[in-house]
Amino acid sequence: MVNLSGQSIFPKGLSILVPIAVAGMALMSIVGMQLYAPSGLKGSGMNSNPTEKISATAAQQAQQQETARLKLLKLLPALGYNNLLADWTFLSFLQYFGDDPAREKTNYELLDDYFEVIVTHDPRWVEMYNFLSTSVSFYQARPDLTVQLIERGLQSLSPAKNSKAWLVWRTKGIDELLLLGDSQASAKSHEMAAQWAEHTPDQDFSPRLREFAETLKQNPDHLLIRIQTWLMVYSTTQDKLVRKRAIQELLELGVKIKTQDNGELTFIIPPETSKKQNKKK
């Protein structure tokens, strides 16, 4: 039998504080977990039924409550639940993002706040960065914030930690090229994507990424590259807003668009586009 009557290691009078401290930490953990949960602490104030109409006043109040909750989430310690808290914050983001009636009243100004919390607690979650780009760059119209958050996340990423990490550099490079108009930054990002793709199951992408980067460095205003990249954006998403933006940009770049009998779109790149680019080489 173990003897539990040994002398306490705490000075007399302080030992009583130990269970209080433990209880305090437990309480903080519970409160923190409730705050991170999709419903928040006594609910986040978001519309629980996104199909219902909501008044402008109610939408603003819900937005203010969610703003306050997200500020707390940025300050509270994770207490070892980083991945779980990032997951719950992502679920809250989905609820906020999908609440169309409320977003019509308040717009999407909290999107970067959700992803700041997520990137802080789980920066190695590679798949999350696509949602970051689509939502913050297109819906919130802040690709600059997308790039800033991606740069923070990349500090914790490497191909050794996740073989798909090169995709994050690729996402950054696309936003820099198409939405920020920074061809040189995009070229650097694609060079890094190529470097990180080496010695991974996706190593076949590395030469193409390097070629893409080299083309941008030699011709920052390469029209065909922009057209092909917008076509890639259109074909890899089902999001209506992103597709609408891609179509708009392609039309401005001179691409002809025809609607087939089945409703699918056909994109026709003017022959002179390729000829012009070949002359510049």
Model-flagged regions — what are they?
Residues 119, 154-161, 194-201, 234-235, ...:
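A conserved position within tetratricopeptide repeats
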Residues 81-99, 122-139, 162-179, 192, ...:
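Amphipathic alpha-helical repeat scaffolds of TPR domains
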Residues 209-281:
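Terminal, low-structured helical/coil segments at or just beyond the last alpha-helical repeat
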Residues 69-78, 96, 104-122, 145-158:
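Amphipathic alpha-helices of TPR/Sel1-like and other helical repeat/solenoid scaffolds
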Residues 1-78, 82, 266-281:
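Extreme N-terminal leader/anchor segments
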Residues 99-107, 137-145, 178-186:
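Short coil/turn connectors between adjacent alpha-helices in alpha-solenoid helical repeat scaffolds
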Residues 111, 146, 185-187, 226, ...:
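Solenoid-repeat scaffolds in large eukaryotic assemblies
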Residues 108, 115, 150, 189-190, ...:
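Inward-facing hydrophobic residues that define packing positions of alpha-helical scaffold repeats
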